[in-house]
Design a protein with these regions (language model features):
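Membrane-water interface segments that mark the loop-to-transmembrane alpha-helix transition
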Residues: 23, 28-78, 85, 89-90, ...
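Transmembrane helical elements of multi-pass membrane transporters/channels
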Residues: 1-2, 126-127, 148-163, 167, ...
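Alpha-helical transmembrane segments of multi-pass membrane transporters/permeases
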Residues: 48-53, 92, 96, 110-136, ...
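Alpha-helical transmembrane segments and their helix-entry boundary regions
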Residues: 17, 55, 117-123, 148-149, ...
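C-terminal transmembrane helix end/exit motif
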Residues: 39, 106-113, 117, 139-140, ...
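Hydrophobic alpha-helical transmembrane segments
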Residues: 21-24, 84-95, 122-169, 228
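Helix-loop interface residues and adjacent transmembrane-helix termini in multi-pass membrane transporters
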Residues: 11-14, 49, 113-114, 142, ...
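Helix-loop junctions and terminal segments of transmembrane helices
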Residues: 5, 31-50, 113, 227, ...
Length: 278
């Protein structure tokens, strides 16, 4: 995001950079809401109490509901005269762009659940590099910013679909694809508290951006985006070191090996402290 934000401010103006900054913040909130806090639950479901089809079905529900909610929010902003049509479309396409992460997440969660986090990490890295390079190229061409966001969204969706399909066929043979609606409903209820906590964490973290969006200009939003970048980097790095051990922590809880679990927690605290100090 840092590289993209800097390129936007150079290729266009601080106004476009500000629109990207608030659009990305709203899209990140939408992505977190769509993920529904389900990844950690899915990965630690070692016993396979819920099938992959049930996780996938519930994810489609949350993605669709999130996009409906985001559309309603943008229409309200338009009706109140706070967003013009271009800003609405930019934010909408950025929200759609980040929903790719939510859809990918259920597949990569299944890979990690089956002990193949390496596949998910590899495919996610490939798609992320593709999306970042593509966005940088589109920005460098200095085409209309709205068109750059639209092309980025469409091509990223195509790339994500290709990468998911690449491994899905072989790995889905090993999973239960039976979908029971009562299990889907139960998943939605069980993960609700996880969804609320994760969404609130993202919302509170980006709260200054929302206030700037209401009270100040988009150019101020861009400047604030530069200032808050170190905190964003720390958050991303913390996720990177935490995500790989979720399954192992789940196994430790299942086996009631609390000594092993405490070791994981202590190591995570040390890693985060080291990253923060750097």
């Amino acid at each position: 995001m840092a590289v993209i934000l800097i390129l936007i401010s150079h290729a266009y103006s601080m106004t476009e950079a500000g629109m990207f900054s608030i659009g990305y913040a709203i899209a990140l909130l939408g992505m977190t809401l769509a993920k529904y806090g389900q990844r950690n639950f899915q990965v630690t479901d070692i016993a396979g109490n819920y099938s992959f089809a049930e996780y996938r079905y519930s994810r489609w529900i949350t993605v669709i509901l999130t996009m409906l909610f985001m559309t309603l929010y943008l229409l309200i902003q338009c009706g109140m005269g706070k967003y013009d049509i271009e800003k609405i479309l930019i934010v909408f396409f950025l929200c759609l762009w980040k929903q790719i992460d939510a859809i990918e997440d259920v597949f990569y969660g299944m890979y990690q659940q089956k002990g193949r986090l390496d596949i998910g990490a590899k495919r996610y890295s490939e798609r992320l590099i593709f999306s970042t390079v593509l966005f940088c190229v589109l920005i460098s061409l200095k085409i209309r910013f709205l068109m750059a966001v639209l092309l980025e969204t469409i091509l990223s969706i195509v790339m994500a679909a290709f990468l998911i399909q690449k491994d899905k066929e072989s790995l889905l043979l090993e999973v239960d694809n039976k979908c029971r609606l009562i299990h889907v409903r139960r998943l939605m209820v069980i993960c609700l508290t996880l969804c609320i906590s994760s969404t609130l964490a993202v919302y509170i973290g980006n709260l200054p951006k929302y206030f700037i969006d209401v009270l100040l200009e988009d150019s101020i939003q861009a400047r604030f985006g530069y200032l808050i970048m170190p905190a964003f980097v720390i958050m991303v790095l913390s996720t990177v070191i935490f995500q790989p051990v979720i399954r192992d922590m789940g196994e430790a809880v299942k086996e009631r090996d609390y000594k092993k679990l405490s070791g994981y927690v202590v190591r995570q605290i040390i890693y985060i402290a080291l990253i923060t100090s750097i």
